[in-house]
């Protein structure tokens, strides 16, 4: 069925059929450090109608705590970290539910958010931002040393990725017996600033795939791994959830894989022409220009 433009004729049936709205963040709630117009009022209005509001982001640079701080800094003060599910959190939870040995370490190609979530889960993380200035040099009769106790390499969005990190992660995956290769997500690009799209974690993951000749375990969207935690917290059926996102291949596919209703907004990486292109195979149930359209539709007679 072709995606429906959200309108006064179909909005009420969608809203009444949903208990929990799942929102992506980049390109939906904000662009870089700029809140998208009308978002705060929309979230308050949805909550006032007795609905749950949850945030499911593939951006692993921040931890849940840091995302809650970002919401507050942008003037959205009602959000707690328990309502935020990030791919940094998902990476730590994947290790926890799979009984990753506490005596093994985790090498991180990514941001502080992954390291913080690993620490909260009881794991020892290495790498991250502190390896951003290190250099790998080719020297005759010299070995690049790496920690043999690393049992997992987590790769996420890393604005400071370099050759040192790639070599370190590659050696761990290829030479440490049983070492896991985990990707927070494979987004090609993202709205890291308000005016432009920037290379996403998919670029870093692709580099590691090339050097290790391995495919990663992906814990972020469109994988439904995080959905298990959402169901535990809210105890509602996925059919009573609606995923609101700006990406077809992550947000909308995640919602479809989990059995949720799906709503695409056009404030992020997907344009209306992308959506309606005959070559597009991923179609949301509904689409609209921006999240704040919900206010107008809710107030319409």
Curated annotation (Swiss-Prot):
Its EC number is 3.1.3.18. Disruption phenotype: No visible phenotype. The keyword Hydrolase applies. InterPro entries: HAD-like_sf, HAD-SF_hydro_IIA, HAD_sf, PGP_euk. GO terms for molecular function: phosphoglycolate phosphatase activity; protein serine/threonine kinase activity. Dephosphorylates 2-phosphoglycolate, but does not contribute to photorespiratory metabolism. Belongs to the HAD-like hydrolase superfamily. CbbY/CbbZ/Gph/YieH family. PANTHER family: 4-NITROPHENYLPHOSPHATASE-RELATED, PHOSPHOGLYCOLATE PHOSPHATASE 2. This is Phosphoglycolate phosphatase 2. It comes from Arabidopsis thaliana (Mouse-ear cress). The gene is PGLP2.
């Amino acid at each position: 069925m072709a995606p429906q433009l959200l309108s006064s004729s179909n909005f009420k049936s969608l809203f009444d059929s949903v208990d929990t709205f799942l929102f992506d963040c980049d390109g939906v709630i904000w662009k870089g450090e700029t809140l998208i117009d009308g978002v705060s009022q929309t979230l308050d209005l949805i909550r006032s109608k007795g609905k749950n509001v949850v945030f499911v982001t593939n951006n692993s640079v921040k931890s849940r705590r840091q995302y809650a701080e970002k919401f507050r800094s942008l003037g959205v003060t009602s959000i707690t970290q328990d309502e935020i599910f990030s791919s940094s959190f998902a990476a730590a939870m994947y290790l926890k539910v799979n009984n990753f040995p506490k005596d093994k370490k985790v090498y991180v190609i990514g941001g502080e958010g992954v390291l913080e979530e690993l620490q909260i889960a009881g794991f020892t993380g290495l790498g991250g931002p502190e390896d951003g200035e290190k250099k790998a040099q080719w020297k005759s009769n010299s070995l690049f040393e790496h920690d043999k106790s690393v049992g997992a390499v987590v790769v996420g969005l890393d604005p400071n990725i370099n050759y040192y990190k790639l070599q370190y992660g590659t050696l761990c995956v290829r030479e440490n017996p049983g070492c896991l290769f985990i990707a927070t997500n494979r987004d090609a690009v993202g709205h890291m600033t308000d005016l432009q799209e920037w290379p996403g974690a998919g670029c870093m993951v692709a580099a590691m795939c090339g050097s290790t000749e391995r495919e990663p375990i992906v814990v972020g969207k469109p994988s439904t791994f995080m959905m298990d935690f959402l169901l535990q917290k809210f105890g509602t059926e996925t059919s009573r959830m609606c995923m609101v996102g700006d990406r077809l291949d992550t947000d909308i596919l995640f919602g479809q894989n989990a059995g949720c209703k799906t709503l695409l907004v056009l404030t992020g990486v997907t344009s209306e022409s992308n959506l309606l292109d005959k070559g597009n195979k991923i179609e949301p149930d509904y689409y609209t220009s921006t999240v704040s359209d919900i206010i107008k539709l809710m107030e319409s007679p």
